[in-house]
Curated annotation (Swiss-Prot):
This is O-phospho-L-seryl-tRNA:Cys-tRNA synthase. The keyword DNA-binding does not apply. It catalyses: O-phospho-L-seryl-tRNA(Cys) + hydrogen sulfide + H(+) = L-cysteinyl-tRNA(Cys) + phosphate. InterPro entries: PyrdxlP-dep_Trfase, PyrdxlP-dep_Trfase_major, PyrdxlP-dep_Trfase_small, Sep_Cys-tRNA_synth_arc, SepSecS/SepCysS. It comes from the Archaea.
Length: 380
């Protein structure tokens, strides 16, 4: 067999070690030092299963069972299971409580994985309305309108889904309003918290939520792939139904899910998560400072104002103007940031970009702001 494996040796990544990373999909998943230590203990395959009696969520050493109970308290829910990510959590709900052909009513900012999950579960969807440019906020009242429309058409509704914080604009949806609508209409309510649980405080019961889909690698300082599904006890029998062949194994989990470093890294980061969500107001202060400092340069923040989440989306006509005369064209901004030790902005993009300063120190935030100012002022 003629295979050269040299390219797979000594693979390295220096973005986090040597640069300030502004990628919003990565800021919430950065591991604290104490969580990195656990990797050396559990990097072998199935090492988490040393003392397993057949179910991942029941393992006592390491204390996965206690961790899941504590995570339920943290999220304000009753029962929690580990998954491989928020998308798998959403699919588990759809595939268990909905019938083939049912409709999922979901927001206009829903992540593509919500559509992939419902399509895989052989479901239909009805998308609710959002505000127009430049805010793009979810309109809660549209849920009631779409539900009424489907009911009038004799269509079966299986689930109401809301994206708590969308990845395009970083808008925080009004969960309580949508939750009240779902409850009054009598439909189960799933909240996609991929960009919120672990970054900001969440209380599922206060929000009238039946299910929470969370992402460990996106927002809970965990290695990927890792996620969580938290549910209300009311749906335990449906969502956590066990196999007829192997009565221990839960069908929607395919027996066991995150069985290695990802779940252990999430456990090791739990104390860090508990503490950091208490400082959410400070994160918003840093985010709003970035917007306030950069908009006078010719940036325009898209989405709700003031910012209620760390994701920032800027339209940047000033960068487009510079790109027209710079010999590096659209790559100049990426290269100038890289010179200054800043990464995470997509290469070749000048019309708009997304960023986040979540978890950065105030000194780092000021450095990012001043670096962008210097780039614009030097090249405009």
């Amino acid at each position: 067999m003629d295979i050269n494996t040299d390219k797979y040796k000594n693979i390295t990544r220096n973005l986090e070690r040597e640069m300030i990373n502004l990628n919003p999909i990565q800021r919430g998943g950065i591991l604290p030092t104490e969580s990195k230590k656990i990797i050396y203990e559990y990097w072998d395959g199935y090492s988490v299963c040393d003392y397993c009696s057949g179910r991942l969520d029941q393992i006592e050493t390491p204390p996965i069972n206690e961790f899941l109970e504590d995570m339920s308290k943290f999220l304000g829910m009753d029962i929690t299971r580990p998954t491989h990510g928020a998308r798998e959590s959403k699919y588990a709900v759809m595939n268990s409580i909905c019938k083939e052909g049912d409709y999922v009513v979901l927001d206009g900012n829903a992540h593509y994985t919500s559509y992939v999950a419902l399509e895989r579960a052989k479901l239909n969807y009805e998308k609710t309305d959002i505000e127009e440019y430049p805010t793009f906020r979810v309109i809660p009242e549209s849920y009631a309108e779409k539900i009424d429309m489907l009911e009038d058409s004799k269509k079966n509704i299986g689930l109401i889904l809301l994206t708590h914080v969308d990845g395009n604009y970083g808008n925080v949806a009004d969960v309580e309003k949508v939750g009240k609508i779902a409850k009054s209409k009598g439909y189960p309510f799933l909240l996609n918290c991929a960009y919120s649980a672990g970054r900001m405080p969440i209380d599922g019961k206060k929000l009238n939520v039946d299910f929470i889909a969370a992402s460990g690698h996106k927002s809970m300082a965990a290695s990927g792939p890792c996620g969580l599904l938290s549910i209300n006890k009311k749906y335990e029998n449906e969502v956590l139904e066990t196999s007829k062949v192997n009565v221990l194994k839960e069908l929607q989990m395919l027996g066991c899910t995150s069985r290695g470093i990802p779940i252990l890294s999430l456990m090791a980061s739990f104390e860090h998560l508990i503490e950091r969500v208490k400082k959410w107001d400070l994160e918003l202060e840093k985010t709003r400072k970035v917007v306030n400092e950069l908009e006078p340069l010719g940036f325009k923040q898209i989405g709700e104002k003031p910012r209620n989440h760390d994701i920032i989306r800027f339209e940047t006509p000033i960068l487009d103007e510079i790109a027209e005369k710079d010999k590096r064209r659209g790559f100049f901004f990426y290269e100038e940031l890289k010179k200054r030790g800043i990464g995470g902005i997509r290469r070749g993009v000048t019309k708009e970009f997304k960023m986040s300063v979540y978890g950065l120190t105030n000194t780092q935030v000021d450095y990012v702001i001043n670096s962008m100012k210097s780039i614009i002022n030097e090249l405009r």
